Swiss-Prot record:
The lineage of its organism: Bacteria, Pseudomonadati, Pseudomonadota, Gammaproteobacteria, Pseudomonadales. Inhibited by endo-oxabicyclic diacid resembling to the conformation of the transition state. Involved in the incorporation of salicylate into the siderophore pyochelin. Catalyzes the elimination of the enolpyruvyl side chain from isochorismate to yield salicylate and pyruvate via a rare pericyclic hydrogen transfer mechanism from C2 to C5. PchB also catalyzes the nonphysiological Claisen rearrangement of chorismate to prephenate in which the pyruvylenol tail is transferred from a C3 ether linkage to a C1-C9 linkage. Residues 4-94 form the Chorismate mutase domain. Changing K42A: Active across the entire pH range from 4 to 9. 11-fold reduction of the affinity for isochorismate and 7-fold reduction of the catalytic efficiency for lyase activity. One of its GO terms (molecular function) is carbon-oxygen lyase activity. This is Isochorismate pyruvate lyase. It comes from the Bacteria. Substrate binds at R14, R31, K42, Q90. It comes from Pseudomonas aeruginosa (strain ATCC 15692 / DSM 22644 / CIP 104116 / JCM 14847 / LMG 12228 / 1C / PRS 101 / PAO1). SMART domains: CM_2. Pathway: Siderophore biosynthesis; salicylate biosynthesis.
């Protein structure tokens, strides 16, 4: 993949963006593997949401955004959506693997 400075046209730019988007989707898949693995360590469904963990994660993601020149509120909101979706998926997975309804 070319650096942004080495791109000679929109085709190069779009190819790089598509590659980055694929990397993001693959990272989300790897994240799901860990989310499912975490369910092994949750004694009950009620332990899954872990609001204290979410409360600690979001400001850290906002800080990472700032350190990378991105809009912190946008990134924090994006991660809030990501995290809450994964929590819902982990609950479904926990129920499936524990035989719960």
């Amino acid at each position: 993949m070319k650096t942004p400075e080495d791109c000679t046209g929109l085709a190069d730019i779009r190819e790089a963006i598509d590659r980055i988007d694929l990397d993001i989707v693959q990272a989300l898949g790897r994240r799901m593997d860990y989310v499912k693995a975490a369910s092994r360590f949750k004694a009950s469904e009620a332990a899954i949401p872990a609001p204290e963990r979410v409360a600690a994660m979001l400001p850290e993601r906002a800080r990472w955004a700032e350190e990378n020149g991105l809009d912190a509120p946008f990134v924090e909101g994006l991660f809030a959506q990501i995290i809450h979706w994964y929590i819902a998926e982990q609950i479904k997975y926990w129920r499936q693997t524990r035989g719960a309804a």
